Amino acid sequence: MKVTILQFPGTNCEYDAQHAFKSLGAETEILWHKSDTIPSDTDLLIVAGGFSYGDYLRSGAIAKFSPVMKAVIKYADDGGKVLGICNGFQVLTESGLLPGALKRNESLHFLSKHHHLKVINNENIFLEKLDKGDIVNIPIAHHDGNYYIDDSGLKELYANNQVLLKYCDENGNDKNPNGSIDSIAGICNKERNVFGLMPHPERAMEAILGSDDGIKMLQGFLRA
């Protein structure tokens, strides 16, 4: 399996993602944002976390104009699998590949800690190794992680089973760290080939670092 990981100026999680997928046995390649094509042997495209272009204007707002994003959109439209993590999620919403937007955290502070998530829908390649209702402990690290979508968009997300993950406590009860509508932490598109989440599963690969729950989250892609 080949995983291609995008790198923008200001990206800082590309090597975390590379380490995570290499540890699962995947081949990886880091792709600079000036490329106008996606490698033809790519099975999964990662839009990694960080602060692309310094988060000027809005998080992800400038990255969407990078040359590589036209290729990303075509890759996704052709059915290619795309995962946006943290800033990558922001880039995917700004680019129109995922609905909604990411706003400043309700507290107006940067958050960096482990937080529990509940699996809402596992009928997709991303979370198929987990069961609906499972609780995982995954790091979060963001300033603009407050997911927003209007009422009609929210209804559509639920109608199409696009809500994948919600923030919760260790018992699965609602616990919202950033003000995200309905405590939403991760979603997918209608076609279930584009995924985005604010938490960092690639940083939860070893128990000694606090959690290895990211392994099951990312393993689903290995059959790609």
Swiss-Prot record:
Pathway annotation: Purine metabolism; IMP biosynthesis via de novo pathway; 5-amino-1-(5-phospho-D-ribosyl)imidazole from N(2)-formyl-N(1)-(5-phospho-D-ribosyl)glycinamide: step 1/2
Entry-linked Pfam families: GATase_5
CDD domains: GATase1_FGAR_AT
Source organism superkingdom: Bacteria
GO MF entries: ATP binding; glutaminase activity; phosphoribosylformylglycinamidine synthase activity
Domain Glutamine amidotransferase type-1: 2-224
Keyword Ligase: yes
EC number: 6.3.5.3, 3.5.1.2
UniProt cross-references to SMART domains, sorted A to Z: GATase_5
Subunit structure: Part of the FGAM synthase complex composed of 1 PurL, 1 PurQ and 2 PurS subunits.
PANTHER family: PHOSPHORIBOSYLFORMYLGLYCINAMIDINE SYNTHASE SUBUNIT PURQ (PTHR47552:SF1)
Name listed for the protein in its UniProt record: Phosphoribosylformylglycinamidine synthase subunit PurQ
Organism: Sulfurimonas denitrificans (strain ATCC 33889 / DSM 1251) (Thiomicrospira denitrificans (strain ATCC 33889 / DSM 1251))
Gene: purQ
